[in-house]
Regions:
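Bacterial Sec-dependent N-terminal signal peptides
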Residues: 1-13
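Secretory-pathway/luminal and periplasmic proteins that interact with or process carbohydrate-rich
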Residues: 41-44, 168, 219-228, 375, ...
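Signal-peptide-cleavage-adjacent N-terminal segments of secreted and extracellular proteins
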Residues: 18-19, 27-30
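Noncatalytic, helix-rich "gating/capping" subdomain that lines the substrate-entry/channel surface
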Residues: 75-368, 372
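Short, Gly/Pro- and small/polar-rich lid/capping loops
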Residues: 13-21
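Active-site-surrounding "flap" and adjacent substrate/cofactor-binding loops of secreted or lumenal enzymes
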Residues: 29, 36, 40-93
């Protein structure tokens, strides 16, 4: 994905300082400071059904989307040489906009993936298959597996294993019993059951599968860290060797998982949350294979719902956007299609964007500004009386090694291996692309 915050400033009206037009100066700040500070903005920008909130960054995003849409649609409307970035961007946008074909295909793109889950014969095979699906975007595993900088040694990357597996995101949705939470949970159960019936299950089977999914996710949620616990950096860092991982968590087939996810061999890993991972071991051992397959099936359908026909999209929107977030109206199809293209080819779109709206001269000016700030800060560090010479030296060394990122990278991502053929039926597009279409939730 690419950031357009600074770039937009070169194509928009320049605003400096605090705008009194966005305030309500008739309100008393001591009584209602929010109305005083933002009343003018709220009156000038009444909330539309598409949004649950609307601030200045949302307005900036709207402006950017309109500019990006113009760039993308220009490529989509005119033939592009096969294999070029323009062809890939235009073809993907057209695929995302083609609701007629998607409605005609229905669940056809999903059938091979569901068949793969339903054909699992053992719990050992289950772990391999869900890892393979996870790599393709189905999020079928019960934990997250990735790579990030080691928090105790930023010069090194480290494999991270973290809690996951719960579609509602926050554990309290599964555990609290207040009326609002119960309403969300009941809507979630109805949503799970609806997705199963939409892929062909009868009501009885869909009910049974829904109960299995909810039971598994609730068990994971009970062991998961709360939002407060997740803010404890040190409490979410448990570095160990790969050998120790195999010893401490024998209920998970780590070799099958690692290879299916495409990870090379590695020596060290951090299990960020210990207890949820042990709970996954219990679930894999205690639940029947049919229950585990029901969980994986739901994760696959849920991940792809926004990429399928309008009925699946509506079901996903009604739960995640309307019930969970309060939005009353879905975004226009073009906005969702732009989101799809950004999700798959964001760097390529970003390259086109900066060529038009953020020229190299603008980047050079901003880099020079940052360099001047570094010099000024360095002089201030040297003049500090309370800082020891050794500490000053370390601070200046850190300042000089500050990696500046402005506007866009010096080296762009290579998309040459990515093939998007607009002439193919949507069902022939790989599941990776199908998942990419689901990014605009």
């Amino acid at each position: 994905m690419f950031s357009l915050m600074a770039a937009s400033a070169f194509g928009q009206q320049t605003i400096s300082g605090i705008s009194k037009q966005n305030m309500d100066l008739s309100a008393k700040p001591g009584k209602d400071f929010y109305e005083y500070s933002a009343g003018g903005w709220m009156k000038a920008h009444p909330l539309t059904p598409e949004y649950t909130r609307f601030g200045q960054f949302d307005q900036l995003h709207e402006n950017n989307q309109a500019q990006v849409r113009e760039l993308i649609e220009d490529l989509a409307k005119h033939p592009q040489a096969k294999g070029t970035l323009g062809q890939k961007i235009g073809s993907l946008y057209n695929l995302a906009m083609d609701s007629v074909r998607r409605n005609r295909e229905g669940i056809a793109p999903l059938r091979p993936v569901l068949a793969k889950v339903r054909d699992i014969k053992s719990k050992k095979d289950y772990q391999l298959v869900v890892a393979q699906l996870d790599r393709k975007g189905a999020a079928a595993m019960m934990f997250d597996f990735g790579i990030s900088a080691d928090i105790r040694n930023a010069a090194m990357n480290l494999v991270n294993i973290s809690q996951g597996g719960i579609s509602l995101g926050e554990r309290d949705y599964y555990l609290n019993d207040d009326s609002t939470t119960v309403k969300v949970r009941n809507a979630y159960k109805a949503y799970i059951k609806k997705l199963f019936t939409m892929v062909g299950d009868d009501q009885s089977t869909a009910e049974k599968k829904m109960q299995a999914v909810l039971a598994i996710e609730t068990q994971i949620a009970k062991a998961s860290y709360s939002a407060t616990q997740l803010r404890d950096v040190e409490g979410n860092y448990h570095k160990m060797s790969y050998t120790q991982l195999l010893k401490d968590f024998p209920g998970i087939d780590w070799e099958a998982t690692r290879t299916a996810l495409g990870f090379p061999t590695f020596q060290d890993v951090t299990v960020n949350q210990i207890e949820p991972l042990h709970e996954v071991e219990k679930i894999l051992n205690d639940y029947t294979l049919d229950d585990l397959k029901a969980y994986a099936e739901f994760k696959v359908i849920d991940a792809a719902a926004n990429a399928l026909d309008d009925n699946f999209r509506a079901a996903s929107f009604d739960f995640y956007s309307k019930t969970m977030s309060g939005a009353q109206q879905d975004r226009p199809r073009w906005k969702r299609a732009v989101g799809v293209v950004n999700g798959v080819l964001g760097m390529a779109v970003g390259k086109m964007y900066v060529e038009k709206y953020f020229p190299e001269a603008a980047k050079k000016r901003m880099l020079e500004l940052v360099r001047n700030l570094q010099v000024a800060l360095g002089e201030r560090i040297k003049a500090l009386k309370w800082m020891s010479p050794a500490t000053k030296e370390q601070a200046i060394d850190k300042l000089n090694n500050f990696y500046v990122k402005v506007g866009y990278p010096d080296t762009w991502r290579d998309y040459s291996a990515l093939q998007i053929d607009e002439s193919l039926s949507f069902s022939a597009v790989s599941y990776t692309h199908l998942r990419a279409h689901a990014t605009g939730r």
